[in-house]
Structure formats: structure tokens, C-alpha cells
């Protein structure tokens, strides 16, 4: 009975669908609209994840002279700022869209402000807690990168575009965490004091973010055609 129920020829529909899906994914990664957002996902989204999860506490303890309790307070303020920013985006997002404000415009404004605030963290003597709270607030702009990139693709590909950006973000978080650590170890071995090494590392991330920001200032291209979508 089982043998009689088996098809005479192998079913290739599954293989074809997998191949088609892979072509679509490859098309997303190769699309200019995705590439202009990819570096920002790596160094803004991934960079924030790396700072939030690993490097904020060593920075404020060694550069700003905070104790562990003070560093924990800064970390809480950073996350509360991010929460407030996300709530603001959720509350105002629909209203701004109805007013004709595009996600890419919010992304440009948010990332531009993030660059300024991080430069102030690095070089100014302004209150530390205020700056990190403001930085957390502005990181809510990261959510706009998904909407901005997806606008250039068919609506059916929103999930795949978002997944591709998430992949870039997590790769960026790992690369920034790992690269920051390797750079610090190298500079410490060269005799650079820890505070200066941290400043060089943070400055390097800021420079990479600046380069990642520039493609977002370009012309928004028409909707891409990817694979069969």
C-alpha cells in the first residue's frame, strides 16, 4: 500500500520554491536600495547594540570616573531614553506619515542628531547622564531603517528585507564588540592608556557611522524588482 502511494517521479516543487526564495534573498542583498541602508544597519543599529550591551559601562567608569552604581544609573537612563523614543515614534509615527514625512527623513534627522550627541559624549564636558539619556532617545530612529529600506521593495518582501537588515545589525554588533576589544588590547600593548584607547575606539565607531550615514543622504530610488516578487 505504501509503495503504491508513492509518486512515480520525485516532486521538485519544493526544490524550485527554495531556489526561488534564495534568488529573492540574493536579489535583496544585491539591490542598491538595500546596500544604501546596510552599512547604517551595521554601525548604527549594531553599534548601539554593542555599546548598550558591553561598552557603555567601561566607558563611563574609566573615562568619566563613575563607580559601578553610577555606571548602572547611566545604563538605566540610556534604556529609559530608548523606551521613551520608541513610544514617541509609535505615537507620532502615523501622524507624521499622514503629514507626508517619509521614514528616510526621520532616519536622516535621527542619525544626524545621534552623530552630534555621540561627538558631545566623546569631546564635551556636558552632563554625562543627560547625554546618554538623549543618545538613548535618539536611537529610536533605528526602527525607521526597516521602513525606509522596505519602501524600495514590493510590500510582500517587507519581512525578508527586515530579516536581512537584522542580519546586518547583529553582524555589526558582534563586529563592533569584537573589534573594539581587539583595538583596545592592541593599543594597551602599545602603551596607550585605557582612557585614550577607549576614546580612539569610540571615535573610530563614530567615523564609521559617519561614512554609513552618507549613502542615506542620496536620492531615494524607485521601487526595486527582486526575483519574481
Question: What is each PLM-predicted segment?
Answer:
Residues 103-119:
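Structural signature of the two symmetry-related core transmembrane helices
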Residues 67, 182-208:
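A membrane-interface helix-boundary motif in multi-pass transporters
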Residues 141-154:
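Intracellular juxtamembrane helix-capping segments at the cytosolic ends
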Amino acid at each position: 500500500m505504501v509503495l503504491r502511494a508513492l509518486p512515480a517521479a520525485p516532486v521538485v516543487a519544493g526544490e524550485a520554491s527554495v531556489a526561488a526564495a534564495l534568488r529573492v534573498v540574493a536579489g535583496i542583498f544585491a539591490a542598491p536600495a538595500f546596500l544604501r541602508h546596510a552599512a547604517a544597519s551595521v554601525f548604527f543599529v549594531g553599534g548601539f547594540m554593542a555599546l548598550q550591551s558591553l561598552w557603555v559601562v567601561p566607558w563611563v567608569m574609566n573615562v568619566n570616573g563613575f563607580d559601578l552604581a553610577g555606571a548602572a544609573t547611566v545604563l538605566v537612563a540610556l534604556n529609559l531614553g530608548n523606551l521613551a523614543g520608541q513610544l514617541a515614534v509609535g505615537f507620532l509615527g502615523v501622524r507624521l506619515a499622514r503629514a507626508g514625512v517619509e521614514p528616510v527623513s526621520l532616519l536622516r534627522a535621527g542619525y544626524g542628531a545621534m552623530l552630534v550627541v555621540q561627538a558631545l559624549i566623546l569631546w564635551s564636558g556636558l552632563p554625562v547622564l543627560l547625554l546618554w539619556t538623549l543618545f538613548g532617545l535618539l536611537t529610536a530612529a533605528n526602527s525607521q531603517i526597516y521602513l525606509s529600506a522596505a519602501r524600495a521593495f514590493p510590500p510582500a518582501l517587507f519581512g525578508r528585507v527586515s530579516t536581512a537588515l537584522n542580519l546586518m545589525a547583529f553582524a555589526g554588533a558582534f563586529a563592533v564588540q569584537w573589534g573594539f576589544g581587539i583595538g583596545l588590547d592592541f593599543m594597551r600593548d602599545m602603551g596607550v592608556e585605557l582612557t585614550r584607547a577607549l576614546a580612539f575606539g569610540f571615535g573610530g565607531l563614530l567615523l564609521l557611522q559617519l561614512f554609513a550615514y552618507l549613502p542615506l543622504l542620496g536620492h531615494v530610488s524607485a521601487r526595486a524588482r527582486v526575483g519574481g516578487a
